[in-house]
Amino acid sequence: MFGVSRGAFPSATTQPFGSTGSTFGGQQQQQQPVANTSAFGLSQQTNTTQAPAFGNFGNQTSNSPFGMSGSTTANGTPFGQSQLTNNNASGSIFGGMGNNTALSAGSASVVPNSTAGTSIKPFTTFEEKDPTTGVINVFQSITCMPEYRNFSFEELRFQDYQAGRKFGTSQNGTGTTFNNPQGTTNTGFGIMGNNNSTTSATTGGLFGQKPATGMFGTGTGSGGGFGSGATNSTGLFGSSTNLSGNSAFGANKPATSGGLFGNTTNNPTNGTNNTGLFGQQNSNTNGGLFGQQQNSFGANNVSNGGAFGQVNRGAFPQQQTQQGSGGIFGQSNANANGGAFGQQQGTGALFGAKPASGGLFGQSAGSKAFGMNTNPTGTTGGLFGQTNQQQSGGGLFGQQQNSNAGGLFGQNNQSQNQSGLFGQQNSSNAFGQPQQQGGLFGSKPAGGLFGQQQGASTFASGNAQNNSIFGQNNQQQQSTGGLFGQQNNQSQSQPGGLFGQTNQNNNQPFGQNGLQQPQQNNSLFGAKPTGFGNTSLFSNSTTNQSNGISGNNLQQQSGGLFQNKQQPASGGLFGSKPSNTVGGGLFGNNQVANQNNPASTSGGLFGSKPATGSLFGGTNSTAPNASSGGIFGSNNASNTAATTNSTGLFGNKPVGAGASTSAGGLFGNNNNSSLNNSNGSTGLFGSNNTSQSTNAGGLFQNNTSTNTSGGGLFSQPSQSMAQSQNALQQQQQQQRLQIQNNNPYGTNELFSKATVTNTVSYPIQPSATKIKADERKKASLTNAYKMIPKTLFTAKLKTNNSVMDKAQIKVDPKLSISIDKKNNQIAISNQQEENLDESILKASELLFNPDKRSFKNLINNRKMLIASEEKNNGSQNNDMNFKSKSEEQETILGKPKMDEKETANGGERMVLSSKNDGEDSATKHHSRNMDEENKENVADLQKQEYSEDDKKAVFADVAEKDASFINENYYISPSLDTLSSYSLLQLRKVPHLVVGHKSYGKIEFLEPVDLAGIPLTSLGGVIITFEPKTCIIYANLPNRPKRGEGINVRARITCFNCYPVDKSTRKPIKDPNHQLVKRHIERLKKNPNSKFESYDADSGTYVFIVNHAAEQT
């Protein structure tokens, strides 16, 4: 490819691109005087000055690569345009006319003294101190300089254009397209104001070349490629072309420097030898682009290196007839010149290696890429400093290089004295295959890049005796394997392929073998006799033959990387192998039935093996030694001599009679039939059904064996232990029964020390207990209200008290307090001071009474009693006048005068007087003498003063309806005497029944009521209860009559003193036109289940009708 002398494809006559000239500036052979074509078909001149790479660069007589003439005529532009002969206007590369006329500003006139532009002073930053802040400001604008501050940027640019300073400063004040000085030279393209004069100044062209304008600014008298001058001017990149030895990229011809990248071409006139592509020395047979000879791509029929140091054969591997040298990475070169990376050569190497020194990385010219020395007398070090002598120097990682020391991975080295990169001997390559002069990856003598022979072509199309780049060899000489290990000759010693296939003739890339060779070697993934202890990288050793990636091994082999000992042979990756007894495959069992191998073997990953169990299946071998079951299957070995066997993960194992120890499967029992096996275990979930002497039960199943064994985890024990366990349980139960009489909770320690509370062993007591909120301060009624201290002396009642005498009632302390438990009210009348505290203490009985409604009345009555006692203390008005019931009735019938007094319960106590002296009792109203606090507390209980007409009307109505008072302040009509005279039938239908309270209101039943089952005295105060602005029927009685029964009939209810109260004065509002009164009436009309009848604003009387009295409040 790079340095062979054949054509592109197997052809013996043509060059790679149809040319026989130099490739990239290579020197033509002096023995070829005929005219040759260039690389692209351009005809070469026959003079002694040879053409460079493309026949144009620096050549005065060759054709231009793009059709332009390479002669010294004046019309040699690259694209065919003719150059002008005018000295002041020569043509550019694209035919543009160049001139020396400066840019003009159109019709604008130039002001005087304005052509200085920016040439007065070079640009510098202008600094100025800020007077306010004291900070120095640095201005990066040229218009801030004092020399140019009168001009703007555009003005300065215009002045520079007028002065011809458009492209920067030069010696003559003009510039070129790419800022090269243009004085009198021709610039690159001639269209941007450049001067295309044809003077012979010494300035360069487009890239700094001489002024002769060529293709890109070269002179008209030459045809250089990129502006190289024809005479005494530079070449393509500025090199001088006045001599006849220059190369394509500007190397000086008479010097000994390089050509394209520093190499020099030979000067046939003086016989000077120059360097190669990258500066390496070139002998008489110099290299081409990369050090090869000067044919098409460095191909030469002589024995020199190619592109990478290989023998100069054709572009592609056509057959060669000579033995070549080493390949690209240190392979040995048979001739004087080496390859690219450290190969031997007569002159300097690729990167400047000296003739007698090391290669690319400092190794000697005779050594290999990584320090492998093939010269027995060399004393220089390898790549990493190892000595390449015959002495026992270490390898890359310090291993010994003699025959007694191992390699990098512990393999024994052969009898060679020195090893390579990984400890292998120099007779083998980097991975252990033997060689005489190996390449980088262990190629055989004088191999190529990937192990091919040095005489081989690039892509395995060569017909020489050596291998190609991928190792296939079409000859019958001894050669080595290629990249993937296949071998293309019929030599007796060949390495294996990449995946273990043998390298015979007609081999395919992945191990299929076409011929039978007596001895072969493995390659990268195949076993090798010298690399790593006769094993391959992935465990296959091929002392005789190698396996394929999915094929069969036909010979005995040793174990490799993954532990399988390949003693006669190893199985394929997915299949078995027809050779002797070996290890199982990855997914299958080993189908070998060799009985001569007594060694132990192991099962495959998913299948069984001859002697050992596979990963998922039992073993099927007949080996006499130990074998194990697969991971999912049993061990199916039928050998009776097996000493140790194990079942599979999920299955049992039918081990023979000679097994001594066997374990059950994970989910199955152990079906061992061995008579000598004294110890067997059951499966995880199954019982042990063997007849062994000692067995354990499964996890969830009992042990059904006849011998002594343990039960399962969640099951009953076996029959052999039933009697002993039953006896033990009976004994324990008897002991528990003896103690159970004393402790009803058994003998468990959890309950033996437990204490039983009284709530468990004793009946439930009443839950009502005395509440103790705080032991230090008891919450009682006596603490809430301050008790009145007793007086030291009490006044006795006068015996001549007319009132008491008339009433003829003795003062009884028991009558001073009246407690009505059914009505939950306490009425405190006139009592002595010594009994007041006792009365309050008795009232605490109702403190936690669930039937009570409120203590508001109690508190208000007590306060009113205290105020009344203080007001009436010492007066006779404090006495109470009592009359008999008959006298009271007579007084009502006679309509005597009535006096009213305010009593302790807040109501009006009517005193029936027998005096007929006409004294007006209306003037004896008592004003309330209470403080402001008492007024607020009893605002709703304040007695409203009736007019004399109202009082007379109330009592006249009671007297006319045959009414009588019951309990306290309650009256009933008909009276009790009348109702007592009714028969039972009459009591079932009592018409016009009225029950009322003298202060709060009354109820009139509009339908007959049934009083047969109702105590008459309990109608007022118990069944029917009046409170301020409230009438309650069956307040605390759960059993109410049904509709139409008892007193649950239609009725009219009248409530007294239902005034709206003014919040500012706390007084009732009696004005009918007041807004609050109107609002109050509207609210009364909205009461549910009632029919509004009337409201009197003066008296505060509210009258409404209900359909069912017992269901309303």
UniProtKB/Swiss-Prot annotation:
The keyword Transferase does not apply. The modification Phosphoserine is found at residue 886. PROSITE patterns: NUP_C (PS51434). Residues 916-939 have a biased composition (Basic and acidic residues). Residues 92-172 are annotated as: Interaction with AFG2. Belongs to the nucleoporin GLFG family. This is Nucleoporin NUP116/NSP116. It comes from Saccharomyces cerevisiae (strain ATCC 204508 / S288c). The lineage of its organism: Eukaryota, Fungi, Dikarya, Ascomycota, Saccharomycotina. The gene is NUP116.
